[in-house]
Design a protein with these regions (language model features):
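Generic signature of intrinsically disordered, low-complexity, basic-rich segments
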Residues: 6-7, 97
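Conserved AMP-binding/adenylate-forming core of the ANL superfamily
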Residues: 8, 16-63, 67, 71, ...
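Structural core segment of the AMP-binding/adenylate-forming
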Residues: 75-129
């Protein structure tokens, strides 16, 4: 059992409860998050071609989307590789190379630094936002 199963159960049992808040504002309820996670997991499998057990790197700032992509990776049966967004691109490249990640998800503001790493990391096939 993985963490995405707990989110799916919470989405069904306490779906209307807030699960992500940003300041005073509710960003997502349990049911909304569970639905988004399932959709993102499907896109990860279909568009990125990742199969269960493969690694997906996440170079993202602290935002609700990080939680969505992290849970989507677990939902898809992937091994999530969260990488500190404050690291230097050389350090990120080192982690990407050593983790065996084929794909990386980055927040849009980090694409300029992370996107070009696809040319420097042999096993990395793509970086998406």
């Amino acid at each position: 059992m993985n963490m995405a199963v707990f989110l799916d159960r919470a989405g069904r049992s306490v779906g209307g409860r807030p699960v992500i808040t940003v300041g005073e504002k509710t960003h997502s309820t349990c049911a909304e998050l569970a639905g988004r996670v399932a959709r993102i997991a499907g896109r990860i499998r279909d568009r990125l071609g990742l199969a269960p057990g493969e690694r997906l790197a996440l170079v993202m700032k602290n935002c609700p989307e990080f939680i969505e992509v992290l849970y989507a990776a677990w939902h898809a049966g992937l091994c999530a590789v969260p990488i500190n967004a404050k690291l230097h691109p050389r350090e990120i490249a080192f982690i990407l190379d050593n983790s065996g990640s084929r794909c990386c998800v980055a927040t849009p503001d980090l694409m300029e630094a992370v996107g070009p790493l696809v040319d420097d990391v042999p096993g990395l096939e793509r970086v998406v936002s």
